[in-house]
């Protein structure tokens, strides 16, 4: 089975997206960073299932946060045939036309998000 940690480690190993955390932003994390979280998934049918993920980025300037979000998208979009742990990723598709602006957090950092569908094979 795939885990958030698998994807976070994959992005870190590929040097994509800068500082990335699983699930949420830690209290002492830098202003410029991202999180990865599961949104939902589908049952496996014929050895294929889908996992829906959200990648949220933040930074003190909106252009920097949006760029980080787009950098991750450029790396993941239409990526095919790679392994996360022992699971094959058949295809990654971004579900948004552009990064969606969520507003500012309690420390005035700008937040953007993109949602992805990972088609997975057993």
Set out the residue ranges of the language-model regions.
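Oligomerization/assembly interface segments of phage tail-like spikes and tubes
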Residues: 48-65, 110-120
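Acidic-leaning, charged glycine-interspersed low-complexity segments
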Residues: 78-122
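Short, solvent-exposed beta-strand/turn "edge" segments of beta-rich domains on protein surfaces
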Residues: 44-47, 105-107
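Short amphipathic alpha-helices in soluble, non-transmembrane regions
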Residues: 68-74
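Short, conserved turn/kink motifs that form compact alpha/beta structural patches or helix kinks used as
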Residues: 42, 58-68, 95
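A generic structural signal for ordered secondary structure
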Residues: 10-14, 51, 59, 75-79, ...
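Small/polar-rich, solvent-exposed N-terminal microdomains that initiate assembly or binding
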Residues: 1-45, 67, 79-91
């Amino acid at each position: 089975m795939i885990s958030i940690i698998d994807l976070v480690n994959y992005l870190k190993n590929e040097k994509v997206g800068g500082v990335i955390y699983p699930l949420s932003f830690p209290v002492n994390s830098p202003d410029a960073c991202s999180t990865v979280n599961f949104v939902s998934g589908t049952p496996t049918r014929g050895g294929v299932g889908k996992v829906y993920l959200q990648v949220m980025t933040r930074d003190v300037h909106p252009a920097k946060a949006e760029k980080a979000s787009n950098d991750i998208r450029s790396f993941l979009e239409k990526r095919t045939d790679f392994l996360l742990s022992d699971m094959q990723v058949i295809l990654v598709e971004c579900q948004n036309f552009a990064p969606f602006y969520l507003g500012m957090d309690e420390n005035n950092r700008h937040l953007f998000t993109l949602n992805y569908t990972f088609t997975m094979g057993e």
